[in-house]
């Protein structure tokens, strides 16, 4: 294993330790704002990674790009509207990751534009030449520039890991966030049935996840979200072209 490979793994690990706490903190913060003041003494209103780390979920995120943290325990009895507030609390985690991914995508494009201009190319061409994370044209352009390589690597994986967290947790399978969001639209009877069998459903889901059967569909969704973020930030090259 080369030194560069070790550094890549180290960077990915640091990014995971940054992203997971934000996801769970967002759940706890949202729950508190909606009336669950028990979050004050449960120790989850913090960005300390150790308070939120789930070893299995972190390992899954590291190797597959999709994972989870230790779930925030919510006292739903304190909510004014159980189904609505549970859905909002659940949505807060994936939303925080999507916002981080958006910020990372913008910064990735800013860094790329700066180098593109410095190298003597037209910044306005960046959208056509580098329309996705890790395009061949981009790596050819930055070959040999160690500082830029590591900057783009960090920003790229910062965005992709956050997208992976959001996509995975939005799957409507208990006890993932997606199941709590969709319960808002389901009958109480059906929600009770899902709650009753959620552990069996989740164990089956984890087994399927680690067999790799979900790699392609989850990868497709991750790629779709990545492309969408690049699309809605396509204004960055124009701004950078005017500034530089």
Can you name each region flagged by the protein language model?
Residues 1-244:
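Hydrophobic transmembrane alpha-helices and their immediate loop junctions
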């Amino acid at each position: 294993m080369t030194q560069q490979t070790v550094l890549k793994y180290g960077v990915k690990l640091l990014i995971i330790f940054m992203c997971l706490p934000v996801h769970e903190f967002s759940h706890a913060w949202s729950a508190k704002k909606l009336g669950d003041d028990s979050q004050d003494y449960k120790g989850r209103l913090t960005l300390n990674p150790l308070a939120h780390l789930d070893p299995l979920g972190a390992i899954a995120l590291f190797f597959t790009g999709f994972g989870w943290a230790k779930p925030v325990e919510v006292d739903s009895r304190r909510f004014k509207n159980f189904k609505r507030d549970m859905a909002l609390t659940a949505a807060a985690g994936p939303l925080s990751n999507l916002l981080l991914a958006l910020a990372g995508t913008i910064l990735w494009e800013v860094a790329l534009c700066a180098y593109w201009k410095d190298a003597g190319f037209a910044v306005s061409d960046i959208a056509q030449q580098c329309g996705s994370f890790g395009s061949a044209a981009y790596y050819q352009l930055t070959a040999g520039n160690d500082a830029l390589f590591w900057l783009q690597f960090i920003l790229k994986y910062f965005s992709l890991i956050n997208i992976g967290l959001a996509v995975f947790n939005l799957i409507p399978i208990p006890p993932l966030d997606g199941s709590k969001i969709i319960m808002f639209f389901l009958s109480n009877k059906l929600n009770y049935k899902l709650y009753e069998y959620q552990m069996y459903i989740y164990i089956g889901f984890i087994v399927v996840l680690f067999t790799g059967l979900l790699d392609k569909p989850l990868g497709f969704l991750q790629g779709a979200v990545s492309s969408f973020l690049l699309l809605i930030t396509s204004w960055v090259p124009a701004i950078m072209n005017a500034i530089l």
